[in-house]
Amino acid sequence: MSMEFDAVIIGGGVSGCATFYTLSEYSSLKRVAIVEKCSKLAQISSSAKANSQTIHDGSIETNYTPEKAKKVRLSAYKTRQYALNKGLQNEVIFETQKMAIGVGDEECEFMKKRYESFKEIFVGLEEFDKQKIKELEPNVILGANGIDRHENIIGHGYQKDWSTMNFAKLSENFVEEALKLKPNNQVFLNFKVKKIEKRNDTYAVISEDAEEVYAKFVLVNAGSYALPLAQSMGYGLDLGCLPVAGSFYFVPDLLRGKVYTVQNPKLPFAAVHGDPDAVIKGKTRIGPTALTMPKLERNKCWLKGISLELLKMDLNKDVFKIAFDLMSDKEIRNYVFKNMVFELPVIGKRKFLKDAQKIIPSLSLEDLEYAHGFGEVRPQVLDRTKRKLELGEKKICTHKGITFNMTPSPGATSCLQNALVDSQEIAAYLGESFELERFYKDLSPEELEN
């Protein structure tokens, strides 16, 4: 078996698998490979346990500006449309209602203004008053005593929407389709990359077991590990990493759909939301919490997996200065300490209850169950030159046949949009063709019309 490929993708999560499919379906590349360190695809951030299983299209994510929502909506549409085109309903993609709610007069005023801006972007977006919310999500309004909660509440969303996705199953489907299209493609599992070497006009991707695969172009979609790999080759040395781990709590099956809350604009992390679990039936997830930790990947044991790569990246005065500036803000500092408490046995559950009751006011301590083994690390990029936290996705384009992607949320939602960008770059670099018009025709006709 030849180990030489046109392109090798490092990372078998949903982003890497989406690019594997996109190159196979729409480009003239002959052979593409994925190398993945786990024994199965999509076992880390793309696992159904690691994320909220949400297609983040911007309609109920209150931290998105209208400008960002317009872009994210188109990205989300591609992922949704792929699943519907392939007939993956109720296997990969699921239909539920979804809403964002404002609780209290200040948040309600914000939600009213937001609706006026966002109804032009999202066709069919409905505004919900307190009575309508009670009809759609009775447990959001009813208190423990069976009486409606006293706060003013308003929201908007959809009574029915393809809003939930199992990104691990989607990853598997991408790969199945790609292998059908190009039988010479290859997937290498249990291939943990140790280093990447440039050898003339080819890259050698070398595993810890001394296996080697070769490519004219390497795309690193390795989540938290992308930046250490980049820095090992001399790229991205002006960047650091703030790993933020999210955890969830389970509650009984008390929500019919997704319920999101208003996010503090100062905080780069999602506000607590409720999501019926698409994999574990009869459970609703409340979360995520946000805990910084010195690890690139979450493990059950706190001391297991502390990352030497991370220490190399972050043990410098610029990163400490960014951290100090962040912690100097009272709201951010309180948020960080509160989320540290959420992880503590016994007391954490008691403290988290108040946040969860914003969504389901009747919740009791007995209803909450810490979701062990759920949640994963999201790498937040630190710009050491600008001395600030960079929100969203980060890409290092070397223009030398290797690109590094760091894709925190909503990277899974945007996987096909990111795959489009990367596939075009790869095809252009290799002098191959890419069928952009057919891509849009299949997955985003709206953009083709515009």
UniProtKB/Swiss-Prot annotation:
Biological process terms from the Gene Ontology for this record are: tricarboxylic acid cycle
UniProt GO molecular function: 2-hydroxyglutarate dehydrogenase activity; L-malate dehydrogenase (quinone) activity
Its pathway, per UniProt, is: Carbohydrate metabolism; tricarboxylic acid cycle; oxaloacetate from (S)-malate (quinone route): step 1/1
Q: Which Gene Ontology CC terms are recorded?
A: cytoplasm
Q: Is the keyword Ribosomal protein assigned to this protein?
A: no
Recorded hits in HAMAP family, A to Z, give: MQO (MF_00212)
Q: What is this protein called?
A: Probable malate:quinone oxidoreductase
Q: What lineage does the source organism belong to?
A: Bacteria, Pseudomonadati, Campylobacterota, Epsilonproteobacteria, Campylobacterales
Could you tell me the gene encoding this protein?
Answer: mqo
